[in-house]
Amino acid sequence: MSSTQFNKGPSYGLSAEVKNRLLSKYDPQKEAELRTWIEGLTGLSIGPDFQKGLKDGTILCTLMNKLQPGSVPKINRSMQNWHQLENLSNFIKAMVSYGMNPVDLFEANDLFESGNMTQVQVSLLALAGKAKTKGLQSGVDIGVKYSEKQERNFDDATMKAGQCVIGLQMGTNKCASQSGMTAYGTRRHLYDPKNHILPPMDHSTISLQMGTNKCASQVGMTAPGTRRHIYDTKLGTDKCDNSSMSLQMGYTQGANQSGQVFGLGRQIYDPKYCPQGTVADGAPSGTGDCPDPGEVPEYPPYYQEEAGY
């Protein structure tokens, strides 16, 4: 199997755009620093081409054995493609056991086929930072040292004392008082200089719109159930008293059911519909056809039966 079997052809369209964008993020300065760092630890030369020098995985596996001895027990020196891919897979597994984050890893094809050299560079920089965190001393200052946990153990007395402390972000309550505050229930004057309203002279009064609950009572309030007169100054209507109730509002004082009849007929009297003369079915005729409002009417027998229910 030839070494060109895994090589891809040129990219076009969106694939070419994505590849060019990844290549634009590749930093040659970081590559030079990684080259110096790897060659200084392993003692092996990478060569002029960074990708081709690390493609077989032998230098990377040697690097992991320097950082963590025995992490890659077998290194394949063969030029076969699957042997080189096996070396890269063993190197990636060794980085995981070394404590690398999964998001910082690269795939074997990213280096073997030069698919994403930017991710390879990011992974090697993260590996250098992890080695610096674990105390590795090298002649090249490369990588970012990871922060360490700062754990503190406090006893119960210290924890309880901390509950009485207010942090600086919360402000302070030292010498806190209510001096200068408006008294409860007093006036809070609203004024506007544009409307020529004078500023408040004191804080001891409260406006009518704000109300007050000081010495609150119902003096001057309209009695429940009394008349509330609605008037309009534009129409010339005058204000009335607050002691009467209109007919539309009803009347509930001394209400009872006296004078009401339940179950009986309610005769409606109208002179227009009560003609003088004889009426069929035994109804009274003449001037007495329609009884006066004060007289008791005579009802047909079926009215009497209806009243008996």
Curated annotation (Swiss-Prot):
Heart and smooth muscle. The keyword Nuclease does not apply. PROSITE patterns: CALPONIN_1, CALPONIN_2, CH. Gene3D superfamilies: Calponin-like domain (1.10.418.10). The modification N6-acetyllysine is found at residues 8, 25. One of its GO terms (cellular component) is tertiary granule lumen. InterPro entries: Calponin-like, Calponin/LIMCH1, Calponin_repeat, CH_dom, CH_dom_sf, SM22_calponin. GO terms for biological process: actin filament organization; actomyosin structure organization; cellular response to mechanical stimulus; cytoskeleton organization; establishment of localization in cell; hemopoiesis; macrophage migration; negative regulation of macrophage migration. CDD domains: CH_CNN2. Belongs to the calponin family. This is Calponin-2. The lineage of its organism: Eukaryota, Metazoa, Chordata, Craniata, Vertebrata. The gene is CNN2.
